[in-house]
Amino acid sequence: MLKLENLSVKVKDTDNLILDNLNLNINNSEVHVIMGPNGTGKSTLSKAIMGHYKFDVVSGNIIFNDEDITNLEVNERAKKGIFLCMQDPTVIEGVSNSEFLRTARSEITGEKVNLFKFIKDMESSMKDVGLDSSMLHRSLNSGFSGGEKKKNEVLQLKFLQPKFIILDELDSGLDVDSLRIACENINNYMEENPETSVLIITHYPRILEYIKPDYVHILMDGKIQKTGDYSLAEQIEKDGYKMIGIDA
């Protein structure tokens, strides 16, 4: 599904290279995790895949479903089925939650949205993720707590039906109950859409108690330095990076 080939990425308009010839291959139905110390490029990786304007691909390729998307704009990548659950979701004043999702869904599917069914489905889904239905008519993420913003990202995921999901520190700002509910919704989505693949960016293995990974990768110095299974994340939690031979 997603292949990163010798991907090097820098901060736009600088010489600050963050990712250096990084390689990663994620197949259909797989859950991959990126872990690593602060400042190693984990969030840069997620934004580079999504096509964030603050980063430039210096060399290498981003291949999605056998198509080179390296030079595509963010909206074009979203239409192809890539979704980024952001670490700090953007506030958009004057655009309601329902208006945003209805427009985004119509853009991605190319179909006109039935308003009555949409509102009914959205109210049900908001209940599933633990959001009050009054937030349906509020400006996107305006006045939302950190946890509410993350729940709103999961709500968007359910409605936009992506093929590839990037969870950039979903567990940051969520209490135990909220994290469990968010992960239950993501797991249910993956069960209903079994070819969906997920890339989890995280510092801590807590989220992996709810979403079970196939592979855990350690990112350091712009490259993946080590790959393992869930036990690798447990080992890092217990002993730190130095104990597995990575000098953080």
Language-model features: locations:
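A short, flexible loop at the N-terminus of ABC-type nucleotide-binding domains that lies
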Residues: 1-4, 8-21, 25-28, 33, ...
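The feature captures the beta-strand-to-loop junction immediately N-terminal to the Walker
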Residues: 35-37
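ABC ATPase NBD Q-loop/coupling interface
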Residues: 61-77, 141
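Q-loop/switch helix immediately C-terminal to the Walker
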Residues: 84, 88, 94-109, 118-121
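ABC ATPase C-loop
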Residues: 157-158
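Walker B catalytic motif
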Residues: 166-170, 177
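Helical segment within the ABC ATPase nucleotide-binding domain
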Residues: 179-194
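Conserved beta-strand-loop-alpha-helix hinge in the C-terminal portion
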Residues: 219, 223-246
